[in-house]
């Protein structure tokens, strides 16, 4: 469905690396995807005003809501950082918030540290259907610290299901981290920048 974006993303990443040696992340990824969406005919409402809605970084002309994320590929999985959930006090509040999907798809521009440590600029454009991440329907367990200052204290929550696992880390502003099996993703495109 989104494979037509790949040549345009590749072109934008090449331009990014003509200017920068570091990876394309955050607002750079948002802007580069915006241009790719427009060039591929999807359109985008993204603007460089840091004023997008919660969970949605840009919306196409046909109303597809996209959350841009970075990620790390490890073996057959991708690890994606998500929302900070501090303002939602209980685990039930956090899961209720997560159940109200603001985005339709997560467009993840992931890297594998092994590629980059060898000097290879390889990205993975990964599309995840947000509906498949049904956090609120999973069995969450408390994580209790085992040593140091967090010993015997609540350090967060986690869930494990067939196609993904997730954790909420109190030490990181209750940030959500999701590890998704690559074969559960809608699309995966390798992009090598030379």
Question: What does each model-identified segment do?
Answer:
Residues 1-64, 68-194:
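Nucleic-acid endonuclease domains
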């Amino acid at each position: 469905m989104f494979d037509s974006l790949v040549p345009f993303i590749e072109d934008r990443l090449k331009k990014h690396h003509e200017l920068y040696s570091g990876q394309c992340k955050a607002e750079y990824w948002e802007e580069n995807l915006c241009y790719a969406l427009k060039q591929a005919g999807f359109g985008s409402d993204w603007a460089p005003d840091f004023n997008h809605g919660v969970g949605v970084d840009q919306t196409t002309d046909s109303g597809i809501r996209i959350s841009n994320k970075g990620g790390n590929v490890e073996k057959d999985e991708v690890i994606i950082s998500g929302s900070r959930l501090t303002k939602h006090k209980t685990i039930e509040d956090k899961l209720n918030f997560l159940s109200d999907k603001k985005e339709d798809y997560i467009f993840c521009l992931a890297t594998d540290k092994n590629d980059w440590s060898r000097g290879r600029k390889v990205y993975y454009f990964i599309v995840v259907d947000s509906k498949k991440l049904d956090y609120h329907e999973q069995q969450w367990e408390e994580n209790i610290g085992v040593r140091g200052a967090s010993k015997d204290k609540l350090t967060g929550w986690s869930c494990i299901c067939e196609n993904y696992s997730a954790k909420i880390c109190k030490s990181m502003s209750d940030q959500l981290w999701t590890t998704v099996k690559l074969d559960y993703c809608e699309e995966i495109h390798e992009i090598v920048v030379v």
